[in-house]
Design a protein with these regions (language model features):
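ATP-binding/phosphotransfer module of carbohydrate and carboxylate kinases, centering on a glycine-rich
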Residues: 1-132
Length: 132
């Protein structure tokens, strides 16, 4: 599912999987010995130029761009707004999706819809649920 591949938990899992293979990576040192919540360190690791963090981001956003291509083909939105905890990555998340999405779209859709980040960030989900 999208949740399995494109969520904060998916990023946590990817970081834990990489622990043994990349012990010198900045993201590994940022995470320390804590188990859970590793995704919150991705933004800082990206700012430090960590190639492992970049690879993890590209993997997650590739899967998310593929999922959003289906949304685009079915509903033709002009804008897709990303919320939830993963959106806290900010600009790097948005940019990576914008770069990868066109590769999954039929030519007629061009670069696809504009990708925006929800102003509510990780509070988007509970606020949306309360409004139902």
């Amino acid at each position: 599912t999208v949740e399995d591949r494109c969520s904060g938990w998916a990023v946590d899992r990817a970081i834990r999987t990489a622990l043994g293979n990349h012990p010198d990576s900045p993201i590994i040192s940022l995470c320390g010995d804590t188990l859970g919540g590793e995704a919150k360190h991705l933004t800082e690791a990206l700012a430090q130029g960590d190639t492992l963090a970049q690879d993890i981001l590209i993997g997650v956003t590739r899967d998310l761009a593929f999922a959003l291509s289906h949304v685009t083909h079915l509903f033709h939105p002009q804008v897709i707004t990303l919320g939830g905890g993963l959106s806290l990555i900010g600009g790097p998340l948005r940019k990576s999706i914008e770069e990868q999405l066109p590769g999954f779209l039929m030519e007629i859709y061009g670069n696809g819809p504009q990708i925006k980040l929800a102003e509510l960030g990780e509070d988007a989900v509970p606020v949306g649920a309360l409004l139902l």
